[in-house]
Amino acid sequence: MRYAIRIRKDTNDTFLVTVPDLPDAITFGETLDEAKLQAVDAIETAMMARMSDREKIPEPKASGRYYVELRPAVAAKVALWNTMLQQGLGKAALARKLNWHMPQVDRALDVRHESTLSSLVDALAVTGNSLSISVLANKKRRINAKAA
């Protein structure tokens, strides 16, 4: 899952970062590299806010010069969350289906928590979905979310 980001020099000599697909994800950095890394945090914060508000997290569609590549687990969590919303499945119902405690469900949906892929596979399976991972060649101007 990779989101396009827009970076422009701000009036106070910082770099302003916006995310077209997540308008509430706005950040800045003192340097271009710092701005790129801050974009990861801004995107994850926007995702968590949408979950808190029970809103769908939009799939990345915009194109741009720079991109933020999120961890595969984050993509799985977004897919799980959006599926839960679509199916009207709450956290408690997911916990019952998986025989999990509520903190396990909370961690499975927390984009900043390092969930195991096996737990995400299990959670997606009870919603009727499966997880597929592809390996892609690296391209210039990608920002690795792990570095943040």
Residue ranges and their predicted role:
Residues 1-14, 18:
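N-terminal segment of the canonical double-stranded RNA-binding domain
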Residues 1-3, 40-103, 107-113:
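Short, charged, surface-exposed hinge/linker loops at domain edges
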Residues 10, 20-22, 126:
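A short, compositionally biased micro-patch
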Residues 11, 17, 35, 48-49:
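Acidic/histidine-enriched, beta-strand-rich ligand/metal-binding domains
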Residues 18-20, 28, 134:
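Beta-strand residues in well-ordered beta-sheet regions across diverse protein folds
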Residues 23-34:
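A short, exposed loop/beta-hairpin motif centered on an aromatic-Gly-Thr core
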Residues 118-134:
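DNA major-groove recognition helix of helix-turn-helix/homeodomain DNA-binding modules
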Residues 134-148:
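Short, charged recognition helix plus adjacent turn
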